[in-house]
Amino acid sequence: MKRTLIVFALSGFATFAFAQGPAKDPVASSLRQLEQRSQGNTIGAVEAMPADKFSYKPTADQMTFAHLVVHIIGFNNSICSKAADVPAPKVEESKEADSKDKLVAAVKASYDFCSEALGKMDDSKLGDSIDLFGGHQAPRAMAALIAASGWSDHYAAAAQYLRLNGITPPSAQQKH
């Protein structure tokens, strides 16, 4: 009886597993998940940095925190446009001297654009050749990979700036 129950349970699980089928647009779907995580962490980091620390830079040769934020804004608007094959938004260019409130709003808008653009993305165009940067041709898939790695790199940098100022980054804060 016990053996019959186990065989029945396993066969039911196998039927369920095979009924799932392959995921639709696994690359685009995965990129959307990564973007959502990046959005929460990066916006949280930008909001956590005090306004008077936006001019902070760890060494003379490194960029300020505000410069990092400006870079993130431009990166998001450009790379999500390329990855999803949608036009980049027409926005006022952010500047390092902009206020914290203005930079927070712009980084939020850049992630909103990414969410919207990636919502329209599917895997069918990943092999298309695109002008990635500076006339360099690459498959659209490269833009998706650069987006994912860039988001990780940018958040890691923002987290370091926070820690150097005694602030715990969002991803390291205990969730209750």
Task: Explain the meaning of each model-derived region.
Residues 7-16:
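Bacterial N-terminal signal peptides
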Residues 1-4:
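Positively charged n-region of N-terminal signal peptides that target proteins for export
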Residues 32-43, 51-92, 131-176:
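Short, contiguous alpha-helical
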Residues 96-131, 138-154:
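Acidic/histidine-rich alpha-helical segments that form the ligand environment
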Residues 19-27:
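Cleaved targeting-peptide boundary
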